[in-house]
């Protein structure tokens, strides 16, 4: 009788999972099938096997990561570690901002001014190329909805001048943009454009050469321009400015204070500076980028995400698990498998790449990690996770050494992930 009830419950659970499109999988254990040892059914919270280990050693771990920060000249940083759907460790170090900030005592009304702001769990960092991973998530949501195909020709969707002049009969697809194999590179037109304000229209950028001369899909060449154009593709199929679509489709549903433009950050004083470089001095970013017509975006999506370590960890929970966070499905499991499927090998950094995701087995012996690194304005950052255990690490900085480890991962990222993983 018990077995019939158990099977009925299991069948109902499986059907419910298939109807939602996102399914929760048990990756931490196996079902024991000896009926003689079956106990009455009890619903328990998922076990977190290592969080107590981290809690018991938090002071030791804090001291170890602080020393790594010192060794690599980190200005300010924040770390968030998760398992399954829970953030189990967070820690911040150093200075987040050199911006003068006024503080008002809520009780006395006294106003004080501070020349620096220490980093904390709410500090928002510009995460540079980690942004590409989030842009790809947004594109893959649209792919699930049938609104965007990975096989779509970027020239047909965004701008006909993106047709490769060396291979006029070969299309450069959205998938090629995500794998850096499109033949569209950070050429003279692009590098000139990003150093100007107001930013020129895409037509102007394309007046100068931005093609590698290699057949689309045949060769790897890291391209910020290509991932920026994915933002333009998203605008074309949604009819919304990229920063608005990201806010409506991902950040607000997640309940996180993040954006590709600083204007949308609720607590703008929480945005980290890069030494003396202050993102708040860049002006009204929404207005500046808004001068580029909707559907012609070629910036933002490649590297302009501002987010805290804990909020990026929440996105990591989606990517490392079953696409679900707090009961809401953001990506289907088969989509995550597609994202994580190896496409190309980057010999310069010794990293295999999926869809806007880096894949490496050279940080932790015997563990394949997925994620991305960021490097801009002197800030080095990373997110790496293991889908097989649903564990991951976010490490964000506003300034650090760009030295590389033997693995070719940035040395500070390599050291932090190794240190954290000892407790996982």
Predicted feature residues:
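Short, glycine/proline-biased beta-turn/loop segments that scaffold the active-site neighborhood
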Residues: 149-166, 253-254
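Short, surface-exposed loop or secondary-structure junction motifs
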Residues: 97, 104-108, 166-376
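Short, conserved catalytic-motif segment at the N-terminal edge
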Residues: 54-125
């Amino acid at each position: 009788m018990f077995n019939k009830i158990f099977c009925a419950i299991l069948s109902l659970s499986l059907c419910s999972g298939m109807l939602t499109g996102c399914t929760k999988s048990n990756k931490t254990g196996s079902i024991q099938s000896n009926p003689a040892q079956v106990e009455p059914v009890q619903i328990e919270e998922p076990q977190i096997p290592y969080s107590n280990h981290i809690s018991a050693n938090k002071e030791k771990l804090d001291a170890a990561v602080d020393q790594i920060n010192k060794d690599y000249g980190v200005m300010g940083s924040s770390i968030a570690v998760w398992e399954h759907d829970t953030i189990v460790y967070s820690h911040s170090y150093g200075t987040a901002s050199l911006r003068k900030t006024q503080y008002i005592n809520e009780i006395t009304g006294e106003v004080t001014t501070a020349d620096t702001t220490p980093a904390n769990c709410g500090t928002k960092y510009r995460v540079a190329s980690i942004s590409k991973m989030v842009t790809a998530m947004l594109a893959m949501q649209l792919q699930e909805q049938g609104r965007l195909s990975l096989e779509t020709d970027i020239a047909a969707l965004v701008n006909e001048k993106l047709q490769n002049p060396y291979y006029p009969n070969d299309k450069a697809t959205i998938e090629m943009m995500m794998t850096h194999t499109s033949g569209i590179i950070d050429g003279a037109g692009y590098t000139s454009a990003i150093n100007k304000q107001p930013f020129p229209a895409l037509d102007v950028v394309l007046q100068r050469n931005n093609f590698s001369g290699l057949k689309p899909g045949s060769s790897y060449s890291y391209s910020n321009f290509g991932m920026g154009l994915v933002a333009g593709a998203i605008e074309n199929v949604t009819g919304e400015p990229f920063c608005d679509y990201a806010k409506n489709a991902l950040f607000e549903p997640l309940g996180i204070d993040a954006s590709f433009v600083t204007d949308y950050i609720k607590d703008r004083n929480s945005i980290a500076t890069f030494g003396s470089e202050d993102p708040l001095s860049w002006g009204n970013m929404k207005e500046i980028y808004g001068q580029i017509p909707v559907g012609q975006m070629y910036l933002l999506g490649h590297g302009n995400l501002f987010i805290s370590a804990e909020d990026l960890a929440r996105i990591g929970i989606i990517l490392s698990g079953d696409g679900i966070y707090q009961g809401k499905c953001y990506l289907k499991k088969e989509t995550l498998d597609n994202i994580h499927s190896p496409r190309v090998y980057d010999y310069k950094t010794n990293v295999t790449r999926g869809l806007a995701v880096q894949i490496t087995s050279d940080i932790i012996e015997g563990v394949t990690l997925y994620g991305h690194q960021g490097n801009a304005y002197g800030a080095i950052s990373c997110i790496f996770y293991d889908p097989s255990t649903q564990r991951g690490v976010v490490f964000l900085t506003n300034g650090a050494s760009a030295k590389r480890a033997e693995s070719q991962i940035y040395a500070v990222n390599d050291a932090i992930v190794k240190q954290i993983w000892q407790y996982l």
